[in-house]
Design a protein with these regions (language model features):
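Long, contiguous binding/interaction regions
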Residues: 1-154
């Protein structure tokens, strides 16, 4: 049954690399939306590191703080190298549809096409998701992505 959910992908990379991954994510979602019901409607936002992880929440955690392990991972994998213009961002993807696990796996493969590789990923990444499993998260999803449901119900 279709419902609202949110996929989150933290990235630590140069602007060109994170923009490329963002474009690939949009293409993936477009492809899936043409093959409904997996993705009936979606919205993607690129959130800078200085923004809160959950707007309006009492939590004061920023996106950079949430993904603080990503710059550290990069430094460990590139000892002595300068990070240049790398920064932490989060791709926040609201979805009205089904297939959370499939989408999360495919999103992960955009950043890391070969999960069993022995070298470091060019752009360190981390994924997570939000489901409407209680009143708090259902309200969060409705407030941010309820318009996706309304688009499809009209």
């Amino acid at each position: 049954m279709a419902d609202l959910f949110e996929l989150r992908m933290g990235l630590y990379g140069a602007e060109a690399a994170t923009e490329e991954l963002t474009d690939k994510a949009r293409s993936l979602l477009d492809e899936h939306s043409r093959r409904a019901p997996i993705v009936r409607a979606w919205a993607l936002s690129s959130i800078p590191g200085d923004q809160p992880t959950e707007p309006g929440s009492e939590e004061e955690l920023t996106v950079s703080e949430l993904y603080e392990e990503l710059p550290e991972q990069w430094r460990l994998e590139h000892p002595g190298a300068e990070p240049g213009d790398r920064r932490v961002i989060e791709l926040r993807i609201g979805v009205y549809g089904d297939g959370l696990r499939e989408l999360l796996d495919e999103l992960s493969r955009l950043a890391c096409p070969e999960p069993e590789h022995s070298s470091a990923c060019p752009v360190p990444w981390s994924t997570n998701f939000t489901l409407p499993f209680d009143d708090h998260y259902r309200a969060y999803l409705e407030a941010h992505y309820g318009h996706l449901r309304r688009i499809m119900d009209t």
